[in-house]
Amino acid sequence: MNTPVSRRQFLTTSATLPVVMATGLGLAGAGGLMAAEPGRRTGGARLKPSLNAFSFLELLNANAKDPAQGIDLFRVCDFCAEHGFEGVDATGYFFPGYPGVPDDAYLIRLKRHVFNLGLCFSGTGVRNDFTAADPRVRAEGVQRIKAWIEVAAKLGAPTVRAFADSQPPFKDWMQASGGASRDTVEAWVAEALQECAEHGAKYGVIVAVQNHGDFISTGPEHLSLLRRVNHEWCAAMVDTGKYLTADPYADIALMAPHAVNWQIKETLQSTMTSPRVDLKRIVTIIRASGYRGYVPIETLRMGRQDYDSFTEIPRMLAALREAIAATEVT
C-alpha cells in the first residue's frame, strides 16, 4: 500500500528530477533552458483531476450519428460530476457542426450546465496539420485553431490543444511534408503556432502543443519546437503516452515545467503491448515541476474488445487519486 511521503523525502527524491532527466537528454547545459521558459508558479503543486472527453470516443461518435445512441457532451459532464472530477476537457470533435464552431446558444447552454455541476473546462482541442507541404492546409489549421480559441474563451477554457504532427490522409510527417527537412518542417509548424498564439493572447487562451508520436515523439523535439515558437501563449500539452523513447519518464520530466495541460494515459505508448504507466512516478514528476492545475486522464480502446468507458475511467481515476494522495507533501 502506498503511504504519503514526508516533505524531506519528497524534496530529496524529486526536486532534482527535471534537471537530472534533462541532462540525460542532452539539453541542460551551463546556461540552462534559454527559451520557452515556463511561467512563474507559486504556492506549490496543486493537481485537479479532469477527464478528456475522447475517453468516450465510440459513444460520442455514435451519438453524433444518431442522438438516440451513445452519449453527448452534456452526459459526459454529468458523468464527470458523478465521479468527482473537477474538470472536463471537451474535445472540439464532439461539438455539433465540427470543424465549424457551434452557435453561441449551444455554448451558453453547455457552459451553464458545467457551472451547475460545479465543474470547469480544463481545455478543448481540434485537428490541424502544420507539417503539410501545402501552405493552404497549414493556413486552414491556423484558422480552425483561431476559431476554437474564441470558442474556448466563451466557455472559459484556458487552453486549446494543437497538434504538431501529421494528420490523415498522410501516414507521417515525412510524407506530409513531401520529404522536406526536419528543420524546414519545424519552421512551418512554429510559424503557424506563432500566429495562433498571437490570437490566443487576445482572448486569454493558451495554445497547448501536444506530442502525438510523429513529428513530436520525444521531449527534446517538443522543447525545440516551443523554443522556436518562443511565445508566452504557446506551451506544452504533455501526453504521457506519446513519447516514443526508451525512457518516456525522462521526456515527461523534461517537459513538465512547460506544461499547461496534460493527457495522462493508461500505458506509456498508448498500446496494450507497452508498459502500464506508473502514476505515482508521473505525479511525483508533475509535483516536482510545481505545476498547478488540471491533470486530465484519457482512456482508449487500444484494441480491447471488452473496453468499457464506464468501467475504465473510474478505475484510472481511482489510481490517479491514490497517486496524488501518496505523493502529498506532509
What is each PLM-predicted segment?
Residues 152-175, 203-212:
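Active-site groove signature of glycoside hydrolases
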Residues 87, 159, 261, 293-294:
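Residues at the N-termini of beta-strands
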Residues 280, 287, 293-298:
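H/E-rich (His + Asp/Glu) clusters that bind or coordinate divalent metals
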Residues 186, 190-284:
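Acidic/histidine-rich catalytic cores of soluble enzymes
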Residues 119, 205, 289-293:
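A short helix->loop->beta-strand "cap" motif at the edges of active sites that frequently abuts
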Residues 2-159, 180-187, 231, 235, ...:
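N-terminal pre-domain/capping segments
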Residues 92-106, 129-133, 168-172, 212-219, ...:
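Acidic-and-aromatic substrate-binding clefts and catalytic sites of carbohydrate-active enzymes
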